[in-house]
C-alpha cells in the first residue's frame, strides 16, 4: 500500500446487501468498566463490517434524585433474547476504586454530558465518551465534575462553548430520557448489552447481554444481514492510531489478532519516528498519537 492509500480508508461501492441494513444499539453505563472494555470488540467489528451496520450508544445511567419517575419494565416487542451472561460486573465497582455509591449525582451529570456531546454529532459523542472513560478508569476519577467534563470536551476536539450550553439544556435532557425509555422497552437488565435490528424488516431483533468472543458478534451480524458478507481488510496501524488517539497495546493486539509482543515491536518503530508516545498506566502500556488526528471513515 502506498503512502497516499495509507492515509484513508475507502469503503468499496455497496452491493445489494451493503446498505447499512443492520442497526446496532450498545447499551452502556459510562461508569461501568465492562462497558469500557467492550469497545475494542466494537472497533474491530466496525472496521471489518462497518459497511453493513450503523451503531449508536444508549446511556443507561441512573436518573438524578429519588423523585425521578421510573419507567415500567415492559415486555419488549419484536426482540429475540439470545444470550445472557454474568460478566465481571459487581454492582458498579470499577477497578476496586470507582464506586457508584461514592458519587450519588455523578451518573446523571455524566449521562447528560454524553448527550450534550452527541448534539454535535454521533462521532463527537463517541470521542467524548472514550476520553471520559480514560479519565475514570485510568486516572481513578471517582466523581467526574463539570471541570473534568469540560476538559474531556476540549480533549475530544468538540466545541466547548456549545457543550457548555448544551450540558443542562432541554435537548440533552430529552435525549437522555429517550435513552432511558428505550432501555426499559428493550428490557435491558445487564450492561453492556448489544441489540441488533434489521433496518428494512419487521423481523424480531436480537439481544446479547454481557461480553462474548468476537466471533459471536460476527455470527449475529451475519444472521441478520442474510447474505454472504466478508470482512474488510484492517487499516494500517498508523490509521487506527490517528483515529483513536490513545489506545493500549492489548487493544491493538486484539484488533489485529496479533500478540502484544508483535504489536509493540511495530509501535516502537512509530515511537522512533516520533509519531506516538508510550505511556505506562496500571501495568498496561498505552500509546498516544502525537500527530494530527484523522478519522477512520
From Swiss-Prot:
The keyword Cytoplasm applies. It is found in: Cytoplasm. It comes from the Bacteria. Gene3D superfamilies: Glutaredoxin, putative protein disulfide isomerase domain. One of its GO terms (cellular component) is cytoplasm. CDD domains: DsbA_FrnE_like. Keywords: Cytoplasm. Signal peptide: none annotated. Pfam families: Thioredoxin_5 (PF13743). Belongs to the SpxH family. Adapter protein required for efficient degradation of Spx by ClpXP under non-stress conditions. Interaction with Spx stabilizes Spx and exposes the C-terminus of Spx for recognition and proteolysis by ClpXP. Interacts with Spx. This is ClpXP adapter protein SpxH. It comes from Bacillus thuringiensis subsp. konkukian (strain 97-27). The gene is spxH.
